[in-house]
Amino acid sequence: MNSKIFAVLFLLAFLSCVLSDQYCPKSSITACKKMNIRNDCCKDDDCTGGSWYCATPCGNFCKYPTDRPGGKRAAGGKSCKTGYVY
């Protein structure tokens, strides 16, 4: 009996984690001068601690996901380079 209760509780906890939508946070900056654009990362693997590779007007940065939509995941690709983008 206890194992059935545990299994149900575990399943509910697992589903709540899997089904909760996560997004990159919306940037508070709407524009950035070209000389200030830089990429801190070029893929999710560059980020640590559960943060994601997100796009902002000033470049790509590792950001922690939020439950509010509005941000943008970065596209990346082979042409992405870290550092300032001139």
Curated annotation (Swiss-Prot):
Subcellular location: Secreted
Keywords from the named record: Antibiotic, Antimicrobial, Disulfide bond, Secreted, Signal, Toxin
Keyword Signal: yes
Entry annotated with the keyword Disulfide bond: yes
MF-aspect GO terms: toxin activity
First-listed, main subcellular location of the protein, grouped into a coarse class: secreted
Post-translational modification: Contains 4 disulfide bonds.
GO term, biological process aspect, one: defense response to bacterium
Residue ranges of every copy of the WAP domain listed in the record: 21-66
Secretion signal span: 1-20
GO cellular component term of the entry, any: extracellular region
Tissue: Expressed by the venom gland.
Disulfide bonding pattern of the chain: C24-C54, C32-C58, C42-C80, C47-C62
Function of the molecule: Has antibacterial activity.
Family to which the UniProt record says this protein belongs: Belongs to the venom protein 11 family. 01 (wap-1) subfamily.
Name of the featured protein: U15-lycotoxin-Ls1b
Organism: Lycosa singoriensis (Wolf spider)
